[in-house]
Swiss-Prot record:
The keyword Transmembrane helix does not apply. Disruption phenotype: (Microbial infection) RNAi-mediated knockdown results in reduced replication of duck Tembusu virus in salivary gland after an infectious blood meal. Reduced release of duck Tembusu virus in saliva. Up-regulation of antimicrobial peptides in response to duck Tembusu virus infection. Increased expression of macroglobulin complement-related factor. It comes from the Eukaryota. Keywords: Coiled coil, Signal. Residues 1-20 form the signal peptide. Residues 98-161 form a coiled coil. (Microbial infection) Modulates replication of duck Tembusu virus in salivary glands and virus release into the saliva, probably via the regulation of antimicrobial peptides expression in response to duck Tembusu virus infection. This is Salivary protein SG34. The keyword Signal applies.
Length: 315
Protein backbone atom coordinates (compact mmCIF):
# COMPACT_ATOMS: atom_id res chain seq x y z
CA UNK A 1 0.00 0.00 0.00
CA UNK A 2 1.66 3.29 -1.02
CA UNK A 3 2.11 6.01 1.57
CA UNK A 4 -0.66 8.59 1.05
CA UNK A 5 0.24 12.23 0.50
CA UNK A 6 -1.93 13.31 3.45
CA UNK A 7 -0.07 10.83 5.64
CA UNK A 8 3.28 12.23 4.55
CA UNK A 9 2.18 15.82 5.24
CA UNK A 10 0.86 14.92 8.69
CA UNK A 11 3.95 12.93 9.52
CA UNK A 12 6.15 15.87 8.57
CA UNK A 13 4.22 18.13 10.95
CA UNK A 14 4.37 15.79 13.90
CA UNK A 15 8.03 14.87 13.46
CA UNK A 16 8.77 18.58 13.62
CA UNK A 17 6.73 18.85 16.82
CA UNK A 18 8.41 15.82 18.35
CA UNK A 19 11.88 17.17 17.58
CA UNK A 20 11.28 20.74 18.72
CA UNK A 21 13.39 22.17 21.51
CA UNK A 22 11.76 22.28 24.94
CA UNK A 23 9.63 25.37 25.32
CA UNK A 24 10.98 28.07 27.62
CA UNK A 25 8.94 29.02 30.64
CA UNK A 26 6.74 32.04 30.14
CA UNK A 27 7.70 35.15 32.04
CA UNK A 28 4.68 36.13 34.09
CA UNK A 29 3.48 39.66 33.47
CA UNK A 30 5.83 40.25 30.52
CA UNK A 31 3.40 40.31 27.61
CA UNK A 32 6.10 41.57 25.22
CA UNK A 33 7.82 38.17 25.45
CA UNK A 34 4.72 36.25 24.35
CA UNK A 35 5.25 34.05 21.31
CA UNK A 36 2.69 34.91 18.66
CA UNK A 37 2.46 33.75 15.07
CA UNK A 38 0.86 35.95 12.43
CA UNK A 39 -1.12 34.61 9.48
CA UNK A 40 2.00 35.15 7.34
CA UNK A 41 4.09 33.14 9.82
CA UNK A 42 1.57 30.31 9.78
CA UNK A 43 1.46 30.37 5.99
CA UNK A 44 5.25 30.24 5.78
CA UNK A 45 5.41 27.35 8.23
CA UNK A 46 2.79 25.38 6.33
CA UNK A 47 4.54 26.02 3.01
CA UNK A 48 7.85 24.89 4.46
CA UNK A 49 6.32 21.70 5.84
CA UNK A 50 4.66 20.96 2.50
CA UNK A 51 8.06 21.37 0.85
CA UNK A 52 9.68 19.07 3.40
CA UNK A 53 6.92 16.53 2.89
CA UNK A 54 7.86 16.55 -0.80
CA UNK A 55 11.47 15.85 0.22
CA UNK A 56 12.49 19.41 -0.60
CA UNK A 57 14.31 21.48 2.01
CA UNK A 58 14.34 25.27 1.96
CA UNK A 59 17.56 27.24 2.22
CA UNK A 60 15.75 30.56 2.73
CA UNK A 61 14.55 32.01 6.04
CA UNK A 62 11.13 30.70 6.99
CA UNK A 63 10.37 33.06 9.87
CA UNK A 64 11.41 36.65 10.53
CA UNK A 65 14.05 37.53 13.12
CA UNK A 66 11.39 39.19 15.29
CA UNK A 67 9.31 36.02 15.32
CA UNK A 68 12.35 33.86 16.10
CA UNK A 69 13.31 36.16 18.98
CA UNK A 70 9.83 35.85 20.48
CA UNK A 71 9.58 32.12 19.68
CA UNK A 72 13.05 30.64 20.34
CA UNK A 73 11.62 27.10 20.17
CA UNK A 74 11.37 27.65 16.40
CA UNK A 75 14.91 29.00 15.96
CA UNK A 76 16.23 25.77 14.49
CA UNK A 77 13.19 25.19 12.32
CA UNK A 78 15.08 25.33 9.02
CA UNK A 79 17.53 22.66 10.15
CA UNK A 80 14.70 20.51 11.46
CA UNK A 81 12.94 20.72 8.12
CA UNK A 82 16.08 19.59 6.32
CA UNK A 83 16.05 16.52 8.52
CA UNK A 84 12.34 16.04 7.95
CA UNK A 85 12.87 16.33 4.19
CA UNK A 86 15.32 13.44 4.41
CA UNK A 87 12.85 11.43 6.48
CA UNK A 88 10.15 12.13 3.93
CA UNK A 89 12.39 10.92 1.12
CA UNK A 90 12.88 7.66 3.00
CA UNK A 91 9.17 7.17 3.65
CA UNK A 92 8.09 8.15 0.15
CA UNK A 93 10.63 6.11 -1.79
CA UNK A 94 11.43 3.11 0.36
CA UNK A 95 9.56 0.12 1.64
CA UNK A 96 9.19 -3.61 1.42
CA UNK A 97 5.93 -5.14 0.28
CA UNK A 98 4.87 -7.41 3.08
CA UNK A 99 1.72 -7.63 5.17
CA UNK A 100 3.36 -6.64 8.44
CA UNK A 101 4.72 -3.36 7.09
CA UNK A 102 1.42 -2.55 5.38
CA UNK A 103 -0.48 -3.02 8.64
CA UNK A 104 1.98 -0.74 10.44
CA UNK A 105 1.55 1.95 7.82
CA UNK A 106 -2.24 1.75 8.09
CA UNK A 107 -1.99 1.96 11.87
CA UNK A 108 0.28 5.02 11.76
CA UNK A 109 -1.95 6.76 9.24
CA UNK A 110 -5.04 6.13 11.37
CA UNK A 111 -3.37 7.42 14.54
CA UNK A 112 -2.07 10.53 12.81
CA UNK A 113 -5.46 11.30 11.29
CA UNK A 114 -7.14 10.98 14.68
CA UNK A 115 -4.62 13.37 16.23
CA UNK A 116 -4.89 15.82 13.36
CA UNK A 117 -8.67 16.07 13.66
CA UNK A 118 -8.40 17.12 17.29
CA UNK A 119 -5.07 18.95 17.52
CA UNK A 120 -4.14 20.93 14.44
CA UNK A 121 -1.70 23.69 15.31
CA UNK A 122 -2.32 25.50 12.04
CA UNK A 123 -6.08 25.94 12.32
CA UNK A 124 -7.85 28.35 14.67
CA UNK A 125 -11.09 27.58 16.43
CA UNK A 126 -14.05 29.84 15.68
CA UNK A 127 -13.69 33.19 17.41
CA UNK A 128 -9.98 32.78 18.16
CA UNK A 129 -7.75 35.80 17.59
CA UNK A 130 -5.77 36.13 14.35
CA UNK A 131 -2.55 35.15 16.08
CA UNK A 132 -1.79 32.22 18.36
CA UNK A 133 -0.32 32.93 21.78
CA UNK A 134 2.56 30.95 23.18
CA UNK A 135 0.23 29.54 25.84
CA UNK A 136 -2.06 28.05 23.23
CA UNK A 137 0.91 26.57 21.41
CA UNK A 138 2.29 25.11 24.63
CA UNK A 139 -1.04 23.47 25.41
CA UNK A 140 -1.32 21.90 21.96
CA UNK A 141 2.28 20.71 21.85
CA UNK A 142 2.20 19.33 25.39
CA UNK A 143 -0.97 17.36 24.66
CA UNK A 144 0.65 15.82 21.61
CA UNK A 145 4.16 15.33 22.98
CA UNK A 146 3.74 12.03 24.81
CA UNK A 147 1.65 10.48 22.05
CA UNK A 148 4.00 11.68 19.33
CA UNK A 149 7.11 10.51 21.15
CA UNK A 150 5.69 7.00 21.32
CA UNK A 151 4.52 7.12 17.72
CA UNK A 152 7.87 8.43 16.53
CA UNK A 153 9.63 5.54 18.25
CA UNK A 154 7.28 3.13 16.47
CA UNK A 155 8.02 4.80 13.13
CA UNK A 156 11.76 4.58 13.76
CA UNK A 157 11.42 0.88 14.53
CA UNK A 158 9.39 0.39 11.36
CA UNK A 159 12.06 2.15 9.32
CA UNK A 160 14.76 -0.05 10.82
CA UNK A 161 12.73 -3.13 9.98
CA UNK A 162 12.16 -1.88 6.44
CA UNK A 163 15.91 -1.54 5.94
CA UNK A 164 16.49 -4.98 7.44
CA UNK A 165 13.89 -6.45 5.08
CA UNK A 166 15.53 -4.72 2.11
CA UNK A 167 18.95 -6.08 3.04
CA UNK A 168 17.60 -9.61 3.43
CA UNK A 169 15.76 -9.33 0.11
CA UNK A 170 18.92 -8.17 -1.69
CA UNK A 171 20.94 -10.94 -0.03
CA UNK A 172 18.51 -13.67 -1.10
CA UNK A 173 18.25 -12.36 -4.67
CA UNK A 174 22.02 -12.15 -5.02
CA UNK A 175 22.26 -15.79 -4.03
CA UNK A 176 20.69 -16.57 -7.40
CA UNK A 177 22.49 -13.67 -9.11
CA UNK A 178 19.14 -12.02 -9.85
CA UNK A 179 20.57 -8.50 -9.98
CA UNK A 180 17.68 -7.05 -12.00
CA UNK A 181 15.37 -7.64 -9.04
CA UNK A 182 17.55 -5.72 -6.56
CA UNK A 183 18.11 -2.53 -8.50
CA UNK A 184 15.72 -0.17 -6.70
CA UNK A 185 16.53 -1.45 -3.21
CA UNK A 186 20.28 -1.57 -3.86
CA UNK A 187 20.32 2.09 -4.89
CA UNK A 188 18.48 3.04 -1.70
CA UNK A 189 20.79 0.98 0.51
CA UNK A 190 23.91 2.37 -1.16
CA UNK A 191 22.80 5.83 -0.04
CA UNK A 192 21.43 5.05 3.39
CA UNK A 193 22.72 1.73 4.74
CA UNK A 194 25.82 0.71 2.82
CA UNK A 195 27.71 -0.46 5.91
CA UNK A 196 24.80 -2.57 7.14
CA UNK A 197 24.27 -4.00 3.67
CA UNK A 198 27.84 -5.21 3.32
CA UNK A 199 27.93 -6.47 6.89
CA UNK A 200 25.33 -8.96 5.65
CA UNK A 201 26.72 -9.60 2.17
CA UNK A 202 30.26 -10.37 3.28
CA UNK A 203 29.04 -13.43 5.20
CA UNK A 204 28.71 -15.25 1.85
CA UNK A 205 31.61 -14.89 -0.60
CA UNK A 206 29.44 -15.67 -3.65
CA UNK A 207 26.82 -13.11 -2.66
CA UNK A 208 29.51 -10.47 -2.12
CA UNK A 209 31.08 -11.33 -5.46
CA UNK A 210 27.73 -11.00 -7.24
CA UNK A 211 27.19 -7.61 -5.62
CA UNK A 212 30.64 -6.38 -6.67
CA UNK A 213 29.85 -7.41 -10.24
CA UNK A 214 26.52 -5.59 -9.97
CA UNK A 215 28.36 -2.43 -8.88
CA UNK A 216 30.72 -2.82 -11.83
CA UNK A 217 27.76 -2.97 -14.22
CA UNK A 218 26.53 0.38 -12.90
CA UNK A 219 29.90 2.04 -13.55
CA UNK A 220 29.28 4.67 -10.88
CA UNK A 221 32.72 5.71 -9.65
CA UNK A 222 31.47 7.35 -6.47
CA UNK A 223 29.37 4.36 -5.43
CA UNK A 224 32.16 1.97 -6.41
CA UNK A 225 34.71 3.85 -4.33
CA UNK A 226 32.36 3.85 -1.33
CA UNK A 227 31.77 0.12 -1.73
CA UNK A 228 35.50 -0.55 -1.99
CA UNK A 229 36.34 1.44 1.12
CA UNK A 230 33.37 0.04 3.05
CA UNK A 231 34.52 -3.54 2.51
CA UNK A 232 38.19 -2.66 3.14
CA UNK A 233 37.28 -1.02 6.45
CA UNK A 234 35.15 -3.99 7.46
CA UNK A 235 38.01 -6.38 6.72
CA UNK A 236 40.32 -4.18 8.80
CA UNK A 237 37.88 -4.29 11.73
CA UNK A 238 37.55 -8.09 11.80
CA UNK A 239 39.08 -10.12 14.61
CA UNK A 240 41.56 -12.44 12.89
CA UNK A 241 41.87 -14.59 16.01
CA UNK A 242 38.24 -15.59 15.49
CA UNK A 243 38.18 -18.42 12.89
CA UNK A 244 34.84 -17.35 11.39
CA UNK A 245 35.89 -13.72 11.04
CA UNK A 246 39.26 -14.76 9.64
CA UNK A 247 37.49 -16.72 6.91
CA UNK A 248 35.18 -13.81 6.12
CA UNK A 249 38.16 -11.47 5.89
CA UNK A 250 40.07 -13.77 3.55
CA UNK A 251 37.10 -14.26 1.23
CA UNK A 252 36.27 -10.54 1.21
CA UNK A 253 39.85 -9.51 0.50
CA UNK A 254 40.27 -11.96 -2.39
CA UNK A 255 36.95 -10.75 -3.82
CA UNK A 256 38.20 -7.16 -3.69
CA UNK A 257 41.45 -8.10 -5.42
CA UNK A 258 39.49 -9.91 -8.13
CA UNK A 259 37.09 -7.02 -8.56
CA UNK A 260 39.66 -4.23 -8.77
CA UNK A 261 41.85 -6.22 -11.16
CA UNK A 262 39.04 -7.09 -13.59
CA UNK A 263 36.94 -3.91 -13.39
CA UNK A 264 37.01 -1.58 -16.38
CA UNK A 265 36.22 1.30 -14.05
CA UNK A 266 38.92 2.47 -11.64
CA UNK A 267 37.35 2.95 -8.21
CA UNK A 268 40.31 3.16 -5.88
CA UNK A 269 43.66 4.89 -5.83
CA UNK A 270 47.09 4.25 -4.36
CA UNK A 271 45.70 4.50 -0.83
CA UNK A 272 43.17 1.70 -1.38
CA UNK A 273 45.78 -0.49 -3.10
CA UNK A 274 48.20 -0.06 -0.21
CA UNK A 275 45.51 -1.03 2.28
CA UNK A 276 44.71 -4.20 0.34
CA UNK A 277 48.41 -5.12 0.07
CA UNK A 278 48.79 -4.61 3.82
CA UNK A 279 45.70 -6.72 4.52
CA UNK A 280 47.10 -9.48 2.28
CA UNK A 281 50.16 -9.58 4.51
CA UNK A 282 47.93 -9.88 7.59
CA UNK A 283 45.49 -12.46 6.24
CA UNK A 284 47.82 -14.58 4.10
CA UNK A 285 51.22 -14.52 5.85
CA UNK A 286 52.01 -18.10 4.79
CA UNK A 287 51.54 -17.31 1.09
CA UNK A 288 54.56 -15.03 0.61
CA UNK A 289 56.78 -16.49 -2.08
CA UNK A 290 54.30 -19.35 -2.63
CA UNK A 291 54.26 -21.47 -5.76
CA UNK A 292 50.70 -22.77 -5.83
CA UNK A 293 49.31 -20.31 -3.28
CA UNK A 294 46.54 -22.74 -2.47
CA UNK A 295 44.84 -20.66 0.22
CA UNK A 296 44.30 -17.66 -2.06
CA UNK A 297 43.65 -19.72 -5.18
CA UNK A 298 40.92 -21.73 -3.47
CA UNK A 299 39.05 -18.50 -2.71
CA UNK A 300 39.47 -16.85 -6.12
CA UNK A 301 36.20 -16.45 -8.02
CA UNK A 302 37.61 -14.54 -10.98
CA UNK A 303 39.54 -16.03 -13.89
CA UNK A 304 42.78 -14.09 -13.50
CA UNK A 305 45.78 -14.70 -11.24
CA UNK A 306 46.04 -11.23 -9.70
CA UNK A 307 45.05 -12.31 -6.15
CA UNK A 308 47.66 -15.09 -6.32
CA UNK A 309 50.33 -12.64 -7.50
CA UNK A 310 49.54 -10.19 -4.70
CA UNK A 311 49.62 -12.96 -2.08
CA UNK A 312 52.94 -14.21 -3.41
CA UNK A 313 54.44 -10.72 -3.29
CA UNK A 314 52.91 -9.35 -0.08
CA UNK A 315 51.84 -12.38 1.96
Amino acid sequence: MPVSYDFVILLALFIVLARSHPLPEETAGDASNKCTLSEEDLSNLKSAIYSAASAKSSETAILSNDTLTACPMLSNFTEMLKTVATDMEVLKTQGVSNAEVELLRESFEEKLNELAKNKDIFERQAGQEASKTEGAMVEKINQLQLQMTKLQEEIEQQTKQMYADMIEYVFQRLKTNDTDAIDSYAQILFKAKMHDLFMKLKTDRWVLWNMLNYVEQKKDKLVGKRVLNTVINQVISLNRSNPDELEIGKHSLVNLLCWTSTAKTVYGAVQEDQKMFYLTKLYFPAEKGCTECKDVTSRTLCSNTYPKSIAKAYG
